[in-house]
Each structure stands twice: as C-alpha cells, then as structure tokens.
Swiss-Prot record:
This is Dermonecrotic toxin LsaSicTox-alphaIB1avi. It is found in: Secreted. Expressed by the venom gland. GO terms for molecular function: lyase activity; metal ion binding; phosphoric diester hydrolase activity; toxin activity. It comes from Loxosceles sabina. Transmembrane segments: none annotated. Dermonecrotic toxins cleave the phosphodiester linkage between the phosphate and headgroup of certain phospholipids (sphingolipid and lysolipid substrates), forming an alcohol (often choline) and a cyclic phosphate. This toxin acts on sphingomyelin (SM). It may also act on ceramide phosphoethanolamine (CPE), lysophosphatidylcholine (LPC) and lysophosphatidylethanolamine (LPE), but not on lysophosphatidylserine (LPS), and lysophosphatidylglycerol (LPG). It acts by transphosphatidylation, releasing exclusively cyclic phosphate products as second products. It catalyses: an N-(acyl)-sphingosylphosphocholine = an N-(acyl)-sphingosyl-1,3-cyclic phosphate + choline; an N-(acyl)-sphingosylphosphoethanolamine = an N-(acyl)-sphingosyl-1,3-cyclic phosphate + ethanolamine; a 1-acyl-sn-glycero-3-phosphocholine = a 1-acyl-sn-glycero-2,3-cyclic phosphate + choline; a 1-acyl-sn-glycero-3-phosphoethanolamine = a 1-acyl-sn-glycero-2,3-cyclic phosphate + ethanolamine. Belongs to the arthropod phospholipase D family. Class II subfamily. The keyword Magnesium applies. The active site is at H5, H41.
Length: 273
C-alpha cells in the first residue's frame, strides 16, 4: 500500500492517486464536544508540505465517497484504503467513546450513504493515544445500534503513538479487538528514525500468536529509506511522494517480492509467503 500522507483537501485526492497512491491518510480534528470537525493538520507538519489545507470533515467525506464509488465521475479504482489520523489529543480521555460514536455517525451518513452504495474503501481508524481505546468501542456500538454492523468488515485499527508493542496489545484487548490491526511506526520526514520497532512489529505480525496483521512506516520520501523499509518487510509506506515509492517498487530487486495492492487484497489478512 502506497499511502499518500496528509491528504486533507478534496482536490488532493486526485493529486495523490494520480502520483501512484492506492491509499491516503487524512487528519481529523475534533471540536470540544468530540465532533469530528475538520480534515486539518496545522503547523508544524512535514518539511516541504503546506500544513494548512483543510475541509469540513463531512464535506471531505462526500468527496472521498465520490472517489471510491464505482460509476461516479470522480471514481478512482485503485484508491482502496483510507487511514483517518484521529487527532484526539485535543479531547479529554473520557470523551473518546463519544468521539467514536460521532465519527461512526458521520461516516455512516456521509461516506457509507447509510449502507446504500456508499464508498467502498477500507477504513483504518488511527488513534494516537492508547488511553483512547474506547473510541473503537463507541464506533462499533454505534454502527450496531444504527443497524449496520456489517460495515465493521470494512474497518481496521491502528495505535499511532509508537508505544511498546506489548502495551498496544493490551489496549486492543480492552477494546475487544481481535483482528483488522495495522501497526504504524514512524516520525516526521524532518527527522530520522531507525527501523528497530518496525522490525519488532514485523516479527509480531509473522509470529503464530501476534496481534498485528499489517505494518506501515511513515513518512518516507527518499529512495534509500524506501528500500530500507521494504527490506524490513513492511506492508505499507506512507509518503509525501507516492511516485518515489512506485519507482522503487519497479526496481528489479522488488518486482518479484512486492506488488501494489488492489481492492481484492484483503487489508486485514496477514500476508503469508
């Protein structure tokens, strides 16, 4: 999965997919009542990027729905996965459940079109704080209450705080999550980060009793760091330059081992060689 980083304006969906992304990451900020409000990152952000592009969250979902609904004039067949980077740092811990509830209602209405030919992309809810695991509970219980529990088949999870892998496992246990787990690792492109924790996550993914299904690394903009991440065995790379990742995947060292994921590749299944 080539994951376009910080895609917060509707116009950027086309831009990143046209550069080679089959997945995008979108920031979601919340108001003080835990309503998802804007797709917005803000300053500071990655080096070389404009930090302040934004839409209202529900407006963005409408654009995203069009981009992922077959038959729509804006449809992109290859856009198959969306990571919502949920900026829950502005919320109190006890608001996490409410945030999950409100997020589910927004997606149900504006993205899934109440289950009636809505967008088809797989969705990852990426949460920065392990203490906010109840966001997952709120999300799940709301879709059940709204009589669309089947949509949870399209939803996965990530805790994005670079926490100890064992602590992440405990948070999933509390949330009752037993699958659909993506594990992120990374840092802003302005700084360097080694691959030690990525290797631990990959080892967990590949062990018989691990909780991780997929591992992605962020934010990778250079060919050398792309090769290092691929050599470590990641499933996804988040980038500001999808064309760079696509180029490296085309190198002879990688064409036999990797290919770009399509809609038929289940993002919740651990890849077995």
């Amino acid at each position: 999965w080539i994951m376009g980083h910080m895609v917060n304006a509707i116009a950027q969906i086309d831009e990143f997919v046209n550069l080679g992304a089959n997945s995008i990451e979108t920031d979601v900020s919340f108001d003080k009542n835990a309503n998802p409000e804007y797709t917005y990152h803000g300053i500071p952000c990655d080096c070389g990027r404009t930090c302040t592009k934004w839409e209202y969250f529900n407006t963005f979902l409408g654009g995203l729905r069009k981009a992922t609904t077959p038959g729509d004039s804006k449809y992109h067949e290859k856009l198959v996965l969306v990571v919502f980077d949920l900026k829950t740092g502005s919320l109190y811990d006890n608001q996490a459940y409410d945030a999950g509830t409100k997020l589910a209602k927004s997606l149900l209405q504006n993205y899934w079109n109440k289950g009636n030919n809505g967008g088809r992309a797989y969705i990852v809810l990426s949460i920065p704080n392990l203490d906010h695991y109840k966001l997952i509970t709120g999300f799940k219980e709301t879709l059940t209450k709204e009589e669309h529990p089947e949509l949870m088949d399209k939803v996965g999870y990530d805790f994005s705080g670079n926490d100890d892998i064992g602590d992440v496992a405990k948070a999933y246990k509390k949330a009752g999550v037993t699958g659909h787990v993506w594990q992120s690792d990374g840092i802003t492109n302005c700084l360097l980060r080694g691959l030690d924790r990525v290797r631990k996550a990959v080892a967990n993914r590949d062990s018989s009793n691990g909780y991780i299904n997929k591992v992605y690394y962020w934010t990778v903009d250079k060919r050398a760091s792309t090769r290092d991440a691929l050599d470590a065995g990641v499933d996804g790379i988040m980038t500001n330059y999808p064309d760079v990742i696509a180029d490296v995947l085309g190198e002879s060292a990688y064409t036999a081992k990797f290919r770009i994921a399509t809609y038929d590749d289940n993002p919740w299944e651990t890849f077995k060689n």
